[in-house]
Amino acid sequence: MSCARRHAVLAYLGERAWTQGVTDELPEVPRDSLLSARVSAARLAQLARWELDRARRVLHAVEIPMIALKGVAYLLRGMPHAATRLLSDIDIMVPRSSLAEAEKLLHAAGWRATNLDPYDQRYYRQWSHEIPPLQYPGRILALDVHHTICPPVSRLRPDPEAFWAASEAHGDSGVRVLSPVDSVLHAAVHLFFDSDFDGRFRDLVDLHELLAAFSADDAFWHDLVSRAREQGLGRPLYYALQALSRVLGTPIPTATSREALGFRPPLPVALWMNRTLAEVLAPIDPQRWPPAHRGRLWLLYVRSHWLRMPAHLLVPHLVRKSLRKGRQYSADV
C-alpha cells in the first residue's frame, strides 16, 4: 500500500478493485485506504473541472481558444482512469500569438505567478514551452499555461499548429482537447523527454489507459505511428511502447512494434535505455532499490535536460541550479 501511495496509484487500484467487485473481499484497513484515496481523487477531479471553467470564462470572453491537456483533458473525455489521478495542477494550451494577452487577463482575474525569481522568470519566458505557473490565492490547483508541448530550444520541435488543426471540441464549452494520437504522443513526450523518472509509474499507467481507450479505433495504431513520424516524435513513442510492453505488459500490435523500430536509437543506446527505463519505471519501494538505481535516475535526469536545452544554455543553467541548491542546503543546516 505504501508503494502504491508513493506512486500515486492508490485511487487507481481502488477503482480497479471496485469495478471488479472485489472490494468487500479485502481486509478492512487496505479497503478503507483505497476508499479514502478514491474519494480524495474524485474531489480533486471536481476542483480541476471547476478551475478549468474559471480559466475558460476569462479567455473565452475575448475569444482566446484553449486546449485542455493531460489530466484535466482525460476528465473531459470521460476516461475511466481520469478521476483516480491526484491532480496538483491543470494544464492548458493557448496559441503563442495569444499568450501574452492570456497571461495579462488571468492576472487581472486574480491568478498570480508562483515563482518570482528573476532567473526562473527568464527561463520560462525565453526557453520554456509555458509561462511561470499561476495560482489563484486560496485555491489548491495551479494553472500551467502552455503555448506548445516542448521547449522551443529542445531537440524535439513539433508543430503546435498541427496540434490545433487536429484538436477536437469538447461539447459547446469552447474548450478543446488534443486528438487521440496527439494525446498519446504528448503523454510520451512528457514522460520520456520532459521529466525525471523518480516516481513516474503513474505516468506510465496513463499511457497504458490511453492506448486501451483509443485502440478500439482500427486506424489508431497506424495513425499513431504516422503522426509521430510527421511531428518528429518517433523516439519518445518508441520508448513508450517498449516500457509499456516490459513493465505493464500492454498489448502492442506486432506491426506497430515493427514500425516503431524505425525510431530506435543506435542499438547499444536502445539496449541500455530500454533496460534502464523498465527498471526505474517499475513501482519499486525505495527501500528495495538496487545499488545502481540512484545512479540510473541521475543519468536519466541529465539526459532529460540535455534534450531540453542546447549545451551553451544547459551548462550555466545546471551550474546555477546546483549553486542554488547548495545555498538552500547551507541555510537549512
Task: Outline where the language-model segments fall.
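Conserved NTP-donor binding/palm subdomain of two-metal-ion nucleotidyltransferases/polymerases, i.e.
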Residues: 1-88, 94-333
